[in-house]
Amino acid sequence: MKITKIETIPIRLPTRRVHQWASLTTPIGVYVIIKLHTDQGLVGLGEAPVLKDWGGDYGKYYGETPQTTVHIINDILSPALKGQDPSRFESIHALMDKAVKGYPYCKAAIDTAMYDVVGKALNVPAYQLLGGLFRERIPIAHSLGLMEIDKAVAEALQAKAEGVKTIKLKGGVDQKRDVE
């Protein structure tokens, strides 16, 4: 099995609000979906969460926007991986690192798609390739950005009503406010 092409599809999911934390304000729900195509007609799916101020050394060098993600995958990583066997995970990691420094979300999307397509080729779920099922369900958390306290309380209560058991609070702008 060989990689024939990697397709990129930028998407934006609807969100309730802009997410703000101490280091940045950014839209959330922005992703690039990838489809890793093979010569056997199988397609593996992956996704890159796009955060322009994150990646690499705290986003200092490799913040990933939808545009940079599409460029890095289409113009650098896809040509470097064309013709490669997607089941050779470590080899592909080395090829990606040789092709471009950083861009961990781009590379993670390809990595996920490789596990997906190899699992499809072997007729097993991708988690079997990673050591087997660890848990039946995955608990989720809800992240509250920086916002007025009454809005944060209302959002936390709404998340709790929706079944969320873990609430993550953001702070770091004003210590007194953070304690309150």
Model-inferred region functions:
Residues 35, 107, 168-170:
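A general lysine-centric signal
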Residues 131-180:
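Metal-dependent enolase-superfamily TIM-barrel catalytic cores that perform enediolate-based chemistry
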Residues 26, 103-111, 149-153:
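Glycine-rich anion/phosphate-binding loops
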Residues 5, 92, 127-132, 170:
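Beta-strand segments within the central parallel beta-sheet cores of soluble alpha/beta enzyme folds
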Residues 5, 37-121:
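Metal- or metallocofactor-binding catalytic centers and their adjacent structured scaffolds
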Residues 105-106, 112-144:
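Glycine-rich, aromatic-flanked loop segments that form ligand/cofactor-binding clefts
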Residues 1-57:
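Structured beta-strand/loop patches that form or line metal/cofactor-binding pockets in enzymes
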